Amino acid sequence: MTKQKVAILGPGSWGTALSQVLNDNGHDVRLWGNIPDQIEEINTKHTNRHYFKDIVLDKNITATLDLGQALSDVDAVLFVVPTKVTRLVARQVAAILDHKVVVMHASKGLEPETHERLSTILEEVIPAHFRSEVVVVSGPSHAEETIVRDITLITAASKDIEAAKYVQSLFSNHYFRLYTNTDVIGVETAGALKNIIAVGAGALHGLGYGDNAKAAVITRGLAEITRLGVKLGADPLTYSGLSGVGDLIVTGTSVHSRNWRAGAALGRGEKLEDIERNMGMVIEGIATTKVAYEIAQDLGVYMPITTAIYKSIYEGADIKESILGMMSNEFRSENEWH
């Protein structure tokens, strides 16, 4: 692939790690953010120490506070901003774009107010003549590992397979590999909903339960994620892939996962507001729990783990009682789809 110009919107941990992947591939990378000290640090010290204390970025990776400068003459735009501000940033992009670009996003969540997937928001806000079909970049990927060039395999999903193949070529190299998929609904719901299950797995750890319990919540969590996704129109096979079970494993078992760490802290009895303040990063699984619970209620989808986490976070239920309460649910077949 010839050298491409790519704007990455959001210099958080994942946006920064992906900027290094693209830079390693010889592309022109521009990070955009709205925190002056962070942007100055990236440009002058070539570090982003809030997320990576010991990593020095290539000097060719530049950052800017000026969205127009970031978008000028780019071939592709990657959104890696928190779910709750995706629509706002997309509106700002739409007001500036003056040429057609490949639009990608690598965030994992559902918009709280509308319950919409992020690709749907981008499609609604950015005019079709200024963008490709949206490409979702998702899968099992800790930024802390990608930034040190550890082997990572993820998915590029789009309704337009050619757009997905473009993104596959854009990112893939000797340590970072993408597989294509056309099931956007499946990939996005898997990426968003697995954060809820990671909170649950972390809570079990914080409560002192062992591997048997964690394996159970991850496996049964995958079942309820799949049930909801299929109800929304996803292909069930997607949940067996990188963006499904792969992402669930990496997020539901690792201390790198902020959702797992948040769940562990909840299990230890810490208050949510203290957890969020101490972590200093967005915990997408908290907001997604509420959205998923509401969707499941509307559609009549059985999601006991999501319900238990929801009641603990939003109704003040004791998290241990909520989780143990699932052990007395009515007996079911492992393969029930409702």
UniProtKB/Swiss-Prot annotation:
InterPro entries: 6-PGluconate_DH-like_C_sf, 6PGD_dom2, G3P_DH_NAD-dep, G3P_DH_NAD-dep_C, G3P_DH_NAD-dep_N, NAD(P)-bd_dom_sf
Compartments in which it is found: Cytoplasm
Pathway linked to the protein: Membrane lipid metabolism; glycerophospholipid metabolism
EC number(s) per entry: 1.1.1.94
Binding of NADPH, residues: 13-14, 108, 143, 258, 282, 284
Cytoplasm listed as a keyword: yes
Catalyzed reactions: sn-glycerol 3-phosphate + NAD(+) = dihydroxyacetone phosphate + NADH + H(+); sn-glycerol 3-phosphate + NADP(+) = dihydroxyacetone phosphate + NADPH + H(+)
Active site, UniProt feature: 194
Top-level enzyme category: oxidoreductase
GO process terms (BP): carbohydrate metabolic process; glycerol-3-phosphate biosynthetic process; glycerol-3-phosphate catabolic process; glycerophospholipid metabolic process; phospholipid biosynthetic process
Pfam families reported in the protein's UniProt record: NAD_Gly3P_dh_C (PF07479), NAD_Gly3P_dh_N (PF01210)
GO cellular component assignments: cytosol
Residue numbers binding sn-glycerol 3-phosphate: 108, 139, 141, 194, 247, 257-259
One MF annotation (Gene Ontology) recorded for this entry: NAD binding
Keywords: Cytoplasm, Lipid biosynthesis, Lipid metabolism, NAD, NADP, Nucleotide-binding, Oxidoreductase, Phospholipid biosynthesis, Phospholipid metabolism
Chief location: cytoplasm
Function recorded in the entry: Catalyzes the reduction of the glycolytic intermediate dihydroxyacetone phosphate (DHAP) to sn-glycerol 3-phosphate (G3P), the key precursor for phospholipid synthesis.
Family listed: Belongs to the NAD-dependent glycerol-3-phosphate dehydrogenase family.
Protein name: Glycerol-3-phosphate dehydrogenase [NAD(P)+]
UniProt organism field: Streptococcus pyogenes serotype M6 (strain ATCC BAA-946 / MGAS10394)
Lineage: Bacteria, Bacillati, Bacillota, Bacilli, Lactobacillales
